[in-house]
Amino acid sequence: MKRTPLFEKHVELGAKMVDFAGWEMPLYYTSIFEEVMAVRKSVGMFDVSHMGEFLVKGPEAVSFIDFLITNNFSSLPDGKALYSVMCNENGGIIDDLVVYKVSPDEALMVVNAANIEKDFNWIKSHSKNFNVEVSNISDTTALIAFQGPRAQEALQELVEDSLEEIAYYSFKKSIVAGVEAIVSRTGYTGEDGFELMIEAKNSPKVWDALMNLLRKIDGRPAGLGARDVCRLEATYLLYGQDMDENTNPFEVGLSWVVKLDKDFVGKEALLKAKEKVERKLVALELSGKRIARKGYEVSKNGERVGEITSGNFSPTLGKSIALALVSKSVKIGDQLGVVFPGGKLVEALVVKKPFYRGSVRREV
């Protein structure tokens, strides 16, 4: 299994390590519950260095990325980041990603850990007609997420530039704990917070400095368990569970990242798909505390209407919650049933998304 440059730090902290997409990653340090609560009330710090980073440089960097992704990258100012998906020619989602516009001829793409090789090959295969150079810098790049309502006040102590001046989905090159870093106001938890992109060799030093901050504010290092709970509570999608190459953006509530007034890979397929959307992703609150797993059948009045894509117990809400891909006829307020192993039917209410709205800044 692969290890991030912060692996030894996790071991020192006594983390429970697990295999995630071929990476040995911390599931939790003390408990998922405590780590979720730290994110919601103070700060949780995540090692997300398993994520992939690609550098795109060249005079046609912007137009190239605009061709690859569904969202509009060409109109983005320097210093801003953008959430989007990449689709194949059939309109299926290859990956969801965040793209950073550094300058008119330089951009950074951050992709999911499980898709690094697939994405890089896909991107390279489409680069031949553009004057660009694409580099996979994942192995030399570390990424640390510092997330929670107290993230700004705590982190400011270590950052040379004003964090207040970094707007939501914006970033700045700065110095953090004496180390060069890209500091972005982005995250995957539903809270305000920052992600720090640094050279892998410098990451242990930055991690230690951040740990010292956490001790002052009752913050905690947090593992992938808490990350999954937080993202589900905030109703952020997880690639490979809530979406994949067999789903299109319209089915999973991502129509807002599809800009059909420009050209991109998969546009023709998505123009057709938009006219005949038969499924949608809905939020469910289940009775009791049992956790619905991916693939569990979802029924309405005894008839199958879809299946669970993600499920977990929400410590913040004190409820079992899930996302499900179901028939478009299902609506908020409907009572559905989730079929658990052994045939037990658990009641589930379709609720408005998101389950939880935290301190994340909404202005873009």
Curated annotation (Swiss-Prot):
Catalytically driven reaction(s): N(6)-[(R)-S(8)-aminomethyldihydrolipoyl]-L-lysyl-[protein] + (6S)-5,6,7,8-tetrahydrofolate = N(6)-[(R)-dihydrolipoyl]-L-lysyl-[protein] + (6R)-5,10-methylene-5,6,7,8-tetrahydrofolate + NH4(+)
Any coiled-coil regions, as ranges: none
Enzyme Commission (EC) number: 2.1.2.10
InterPro entries: GCS_T, GCS_T_bac, GCST_C, GCV_T_N, GcvT/YgfZ/DmdA, GcvT/YgfZ_C, TrmE/GcvT_dom1
Molecular functions (GO terms): aminomethyltransferase activity; transaminase activity
Enzyme class: transferase
Function: The glycine cleavage system catalyzes the degradation of glycine.
Similarity annotation: Belongs to the GcvT family.
PANTHER family assigned: AMINOMETHYLTRANSFERASE, AMINOMETHYLTRANSFERASE, MITOCHONDRIAL
Quaternary assembly: The glycine cleavage system is composed of four proteins: P, T, L and H.
Name of this protein: Aminomethyltransferase
